[in-house]
Amino acid sequence: MQCCNQLSPHEQRLQDKIEGKVDRYRATHERVFTILESFDNTRPRIDVERAKYFTESMKATEGQPLPLRWAKALMHIAENMTVYIDDHQLICGRAGYQGRYGVLYPELDGDFLGTAIEDLPNRAESPFAITPEDARVVVEEIAPFWKGKTYHEALNLALPADVHKLTYDDPQGLMSRFIVNETSSFRSSIQWVHDYEKVLKRGFRSIKEEALEKIAALDPMSPCDNVEKRPFLEAIVIVCDAIILWAKRHAKLAAELAAKETDPTRKRELETMAEICAWVPENPARTFHEAVQAQWFTQVFSRIEQKTGTIVSNGRMDQYFWPFYEKDLAEGRITEDSALELLECMWVGMAQYVDLYISPTGGAFNEGYAHWEAVTIGGQTPEGRDATNDLTYLFLKSKREFPLHYPDLAARIHSRSPERYLWEVAETIKDGSGFPKLINDEEVVPLYVSKGATFAEALDYAVSGCTEARMPNRDTYTSGGAYINFAAALEMVLYNGKMLKYGDTDLGAHTGDPCEFKTWEEFWNAYVTQHHLFLKTAFVQQHIINNLRARHFAQPMGSSLHDLCMKHCLDLHTPQIPEGINLGYFEYMGFGTVVDSLSAIKKLVFEDKKLTMGELIEALKCNFEGKEDIQQLLKSAPCYGNNDDYADSIARDIDALSVKYGRRYSPELGMHNDVRYVPFTSHVPFGRVVSATPNGRKAWSALSDGSSASHGADVNGPTAILQSNFNSKNYGMRDRAARMLNIKFTPKCVEGEEGSQKLVSFIRTFCDLKLWHVQFNVINKETLLAAQRDPEKYRNLIVRIAGYSAYFVDLSPDLQNDLIARTGHDVM
């Protein structure tokens, strides 16, 4: 790392640590640094208590309405699971062991448990530790009950044969094909945002009272009221009691610890925690400390309730915490530093929870123990005013001074964002830990209005998950969408419905021998056929998924925090909730790979005739071994990411295929099933099944990620990448959604005030072009290579992956190499 001309602040801190120097920010963050060091280098452990008590309750309630069963299971968990208060902590509440931990959701994919438990400690992607006793409990007490009852098994049996063969590689559906990949069986719901403000202003006792009033108002003679509404409302009452009980158990523990504590400062801290946990989240928060604790209890209990995507978002934290912060600051109850310490106590709590995927597919899609509790800052108020405040800047300061990979900070940008805000965003990006990612109001808000939201609702969106956005109390869609490997669709054109990875198995449409195609139009039409087949497969999956989910999942706590669920007495997993907006999606994987491949075929085979189709296919089959001249020729074709209309027009045509298909068939599903370009880390396992491609990519290597250019193809600078993203979008069509865009700068590129100003201008350009998302790595390639050689020295190196940041050494070698291969821009 010392060979680099310029280090980012994050790299410099790592270098200082290697040299034995004390972090210069430690003195002002001593508490959270101490907590972090207690767990940071440990392998996550599996905690089985949630699964054990959930299973015990579900055994005892078979035959009852599902929302009631779920609420009773949550009460059983709240009564029995171990509660912890960590040393030095000021915020309490966790869903499992002390240290880094993950929990199990056997109702989801418990059919994997019997075989997966012994493999988890040794798998390449995100391994977990488990004690022998916990492994025994899983295999002997938990897994047997769920055999034949899991959501994954139901989905596997429900898929038609033609859909199944593109989805799974075995009859039981235990292994993915990585072609048209369902994602609903390794998460109960997609990413979500609760209405935390409701908890802070009302408390769960008020929500319980609302449910009791609705029960009292039911028509005792109405079949609907008795069979549908009453069980839902009774579940709300139970779950409110459950989270209140769980919080009071923490209050009791804090009081017990305080009674034994000899250090007077820590004793008072524990007494304060006991008082706070006895009050919230049952009652409205009165102070900033109470607000932070109430929010954290809500978020952790939501994790206990179900597996929500990769996590439940924190929403617009600088907005709903602001009144408490402003009041306490004015009354002298807190200082900026003490408020920051409370928030960072929450941050280290987030870092200890680790998302656990039992299935190999889930683990491969979410490497680096991925979960991203997005904290949204900035943007606009529901009235359309700029929303930045002092808390906004405090969150940015925290990211620069305490570079933890949680929370996932997301900065909303709009055309009137203040210069100071953009400057501090730029300074935080320059720090080099990958924060914040940027989301553009100028794209998101009009798009959501076009889909039925009011301006106030759209303006109040919060970032959720990788790059997605949600509107609390208006969004109602929870089903995971398909990840579609369109590079596989291209390969099926080249091999007439087959893929080299899968031998003679017929997977796609028989579009004919491409060597017999005389024109580009013939080849394009063959690609369209395969593309549409993949989309049809995804939409059939989604239709089945939508109809299955309410039979397998309920979400009483999440429903209690949604206005429409409470109004209509419907669980959040109900397929159609009146007045709700169903924002679904499918993911396009390998966009840059496919665009550049089609560009090369069109230009070199059909227009310039520098290559025959036969010569191309021969070079692809041998993975360019001995055909390096052809590989270089293919790489010389026009490429996406360079503001080149030849390639970008193909990209726009491909995007239109997906958007138009979604527009035509989404109404049949009762939803907006929109195209997104958000791969998480799936572009790596998807690449492992795709042979060499006509853009010069070698077989089995990673595909391009999101809406980014193929690695090494973007040679005209970062602004050209923004322009290509703009060129490739069909702005006149609303059936589109998130696009993830990764850009890597060297620290030298953004050095000093001049570098900050260039970055601010770059952000303004991103905003003006109405792109959805962009995120940055500011790092030297040499640092990444050094971390590969000596991972222990670089244990704390944080990098930006796919809508989230993670420790570089927690990634598989394939994903590490993918990050290294991304173009690092020296000039802007």
UniProtKB/Swiss-Prot annotation:
Question: Pathway, per Swiss-Prot/TrEMBL?
Answer: Organosulfur degradation; alkanesulfonate degradation
Cite the Pfam families for this sequence: Gly_radical (PF01228), PFL-like (PF02901)
Q: Name one GO molecular function term.
A: lyase activity
| GO CC, one annotated term | cytosol
Keyword entries, A-Z: Lyase, Organic radical, Pyruvate, Transferase
Which positions in this protein are listed as binding 2-hydroxyethane-1-sulfonate? Answer: R187, Q191, C466, T467, E468, R676
The known PTMs are summarized as: Requires the activating protein IseH to generate the key active site glycyl radical on Gly-803 that is involved in catalysis.
PROSITE patterns per UniProt: GLY_RADICAL_1 (PS00850), GLY_RADICAL_2 (PS51149), PFL (PS51554)
* First-level EC class: lyase
Q: What biological process terms from GO does the record include?
A: alkanesulfonate catabolic process
Q: What is its EC number?
A: 4.4.1.38
The UniProt record lists the PFL domain at 30-698
The Glycine radical domain covers: 705-828
Source species, domain of life: Bacteria
Q: Which reaction does it catalyse?
A: 2-hydroxyethane-1-sulfonate = acetaldehyde + sulfite + H(+)
Family that this chain belongs to: Belongs to the glycyl radical enzyme (GRE) family.
What does the subunit section of this Swiss-Prot or TrEMBL entry state?
Homodimer.
Name of the protein in question: Isethionate sulfite-lyase
- Species assigned in the record: Nitratidesulfovibrio vulgaris (strain ATCC 29579 / DSM 644 / CCUG 34227 / NCIMB 8303 / VKM B-1760 / Hildenborough)
The UniProt gene name for this protein comes to iseG
